Amino acid sequence: MAEGEPQVQFKLVLVGDGGTGKTTFVKRHLTGEFEKKYVATLGVEVHPLVFHTNRGAIKYNVWDTAGQEKFGGLRDGYYIQAQCAIIMFDVTSRVTYKNVPNWHRDLVRVCENIPIVLCGNKVDIKDRKVKAKSIVFHRKKNLQYYDISAKSNYNFEKPFLWLARKLIGDPNLEFVAMPALAPPEILMDPSLAAQYEHDLKVASETALPDEDDDL
């Protein structure tokens, strides 16, 4: 193990439809992008993302599919031994949200009882199709949800912090320094961010619809 290498490491699988921004998201973390490794047998890039917490450094080895999800499901080898996961959809594309239950099903079939965060990416785009009130899957399955914008770094650290608290078992765990991130390609409009945060809060306090439908 290299000098100063974090002792605590977790395999994190990043799943969701092609084109939802998974690779853009993981590439924001500059050291992880610099040190990524390609696993040819599975067609996967593994990005080592280190975060410094008040409990020491932790590393997520983030498995990114390199686009093969466009050709159907992923092989079980991708999921095996995953300790946590992020499922991503694109808030400007309803079909990517409709497919979230399929990704969740594939994931929990191989990895039972791992902490999972659902992320709605591209919230910087004004023409949002999947609104806060229609994002209910995470509430039915006890997942955490965050609006994110990979290109503006908006909420980049939130999924990793929530997962770290679950994995370490410390609800008071905090990041003590932010990792070096690629400069924002676009700026998130603060008033839009505030509106979305308000919408999510309202949605979270609204009773779930009764229907048994998965969405």
UniProtKB/Swiss-Prot annotation:
Q: Which InterPro entries match?
A: P-loop_NTPase (IPR027417), Ran_GTPase (IPR002041), Small_GTP-bd (IPR005225), Small_GTPase (IPR001806)
Region called Switch-II, residue ranges: 67-83
- Sites binding GTP sit at 17-24, 35-41, 67, 121-124, 149-151
The lineage's top-level taxon is Eukaryota
Location relative to the cell = Nucleus; Nucleus envelope; Cytoplasm, Cytosol; Cytoplasm
* Chain intervals for the UniProt region annotation (Switch-I): 36-44
Region labeled Interaction with RANBP1 — which residues?
210-215
Q: Copy out the cofactor comment.
A: Mg(2+) interacts primarily with the phosphate groups of the bound guanine nucleotide.
Q: Which UniProt keywords apply?
A: Cytoplasm, GTP-binding, Hydrolase, Magnesium, Metal-binding, Nucleotide-binding, Nucleus, Protein transport, Transport
What GO biological process term is on the record, naming one? snRNA import into nucleus
The catalysed reaction is: GTP + H2O = GDP + phosphate + H(+)
Indicate the principal place this protein occupies in or around the cell.
nucleus
EC class, as a word, reads: hydrolase
Task: Give the EC number(s) under which this enzyme is classified.
Answer: 3.6.5.-
Q: What does this protein do?
A: GTPase involved in nucleocytoplasmic transport, participating both to the import and the export from the nucleus of proteins and RNAs. Switches between a cytoplasmic GDP- and a nuclear GTP-bound state by nucleotide exchange and GTP hydrolysis. Nuclear import receptors such as importin beta bind their substrates only in the absence of GTP-bound RAN and release them upon direct interaction with GTP-bound RAN, while export receptors behave in the opposite way.
Give the matching NCBIfam families.
small_GTP
Q: Which family does it belong to?
A: Belongs to the small GTPase superfamily. Ran family.
Task: Tell me the subunit arrangement.
Answer: Monomer. Interacts with RANGAP1, which promotes RAN-mediated GTP hydrolysis. Interacts with KPNB1. Interaction with KPNB1 inhibits RANGAP1-mediated stimulation of GTPase activity. Interacts with RCC1 which promotes the exchange of RAN-bound GDP by GTP. Interaction with KPNB1 inhibits RCC1-mediated exchange of RAN-bound GDP by GTP. Interacts (GTP-bound form) with TNPO1; the interaction is direct. Interacts (GTP-bound form) with TNPO3; the interaction is direct. Interacts with KPNB1 and with TNPO1; both inhibit RAN GTPase activity.
- For this entry, the protein name equals GTP-binding nuclear protein Ran
Per the record, the gene is: ran
